[in-house]
């Protein structure tokens, strides 16, 4: 096994750890889930570039008669990229004391101001940053509003 294979394995393990944390660990942290809302995806261009470059590496490894283990590892890396960028749905998870947004825990008392833009984006102003929450279904904004009213 070459150094390149070890680096690819490290990347696969890092992506796998992130996927496991996002799907299984994060919903169980900080209390029960009160509401989980799917969000709109950001640009898929980054994921397309990652998977495309990985496909180029697979092609290059095959044409240069590279080792089979490297080809398989690159294929697993491409599949992890497909899962993370296209299959996995980003979501905001509301808990009794706060919520997870982009895998970051935010307490409710950090919210200084909330606004709703014309295009259906919920804007939450925190102490030093602004969160732009783009929900997939516009009706979910009412669910978020009702939840925030009952918890505050």
Curated annotation (Swiss-Prot):
Its main location: membrane. HAMAP family: UPF0266. Belongs to the UPF0266 family. It is found in: Cell inner membrane. This is UPF0266 membrane protein KPN78578_23010. Pfam families: DUF986 (PF06173). Keywords: Cell inner membrane, Cell membrane, Membrane, Transmembrane, Transmembrane helix. The chain crosses the membrane at residues 6-26, 45-65, 67-87.
